[in-house]
């Protein structure tokens, strides 16, 4: 990230404009962006990069933290794609009722024992109403608690 971009993003986090980001400012801004990192992990991240030991993040330290957060997001996205691909057995970019049933059955889960159960599960997350779950819908469902929330 170039220095101008870094400064712009830093200022977004530095709510009171004092040149440092507190743990609270960091947590609130990440949550507003849809990134949920447990407080304990956030504290550990800050401790790792807080070179001057003041408990806050300055712009130089923020550059390191930003890189760490983006790396974690990339890793989470990769895991999400792998999970989607397990369900999308034919690789067409969609999870069908039959694919959902096959995977849930192979996992021995009571959810999805019947095609009707699977149709109901898909209907709950099928935003575009095509009877299938695309990656975006799958991702949204998983961020909302996964299959247990259905």
From Swiss-Prot:
* Superkingdom field: Eukaryota
Q: Does the keyword Transmembrane apply?
A: no
Record-annotated residues binding Ca(2+) 1?
14, 16, 18, 20, 25
Where, by residue number, does Ca(2+) 4 bind? 126, 128, 130, 132, 137
**Keywords (A to Z) from UniProt:** Calcium, Metal-binding, Repeat
Record Pfam families:
EF-hand_7 (PF13499)
Quote the record's binding site residues for Ca(2+) 3: 88, 90, 92, 99
Q: Which GO terms describe its molecular function?
A: calcium ion binding
Amino acids binding Ca(2+) 2: 50, 52, 54, 56, 61
Where in the numbering of this chain does the EF-hand domain appear?
1-36, 37-72, 75-110, 113-148
Summarizing the function annotation, the protein's role is: Potential calcium sensor.
- Family, per the entry? Belongs to the calmodulin family.
**The name this protein goes by in its record:** Calmodulin-like protein 7
Organism, by scientific name, is: Arabidopsis thaliana
């Amino acid at each position: 990230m170039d220095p101008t971009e870094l400064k712009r993003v830093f200022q977004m986090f530095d709510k009171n404009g004092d040149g440092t980001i507190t743990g609270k400012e960091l947590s609130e801004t990440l949550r507003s962006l849809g990134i949920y990192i447990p407080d304990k992990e956030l504290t550990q991240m800050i401790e790792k990069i807080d070179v001057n030991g003041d408990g806050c993040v300055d712009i130089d330290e923020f550059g390191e933290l930003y890189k760490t957060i983006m790396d974690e997001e990339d890793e989470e996205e990769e895991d999400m794609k792998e999970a989607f691909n397990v369900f999308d057995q034919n690789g067409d970019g969609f999870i069908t009722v039959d694919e959902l049933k096959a995977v849930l059955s192979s996992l021995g889960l009571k959810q999805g024992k019947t095609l009707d159960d699977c149709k109901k599960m898909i209907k709950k997350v099928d935003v575009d109403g095509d009877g299938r779950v695309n990656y975006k819908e799958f991702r949204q469902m998983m961020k909302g608690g996964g299959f247990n929330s259905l």
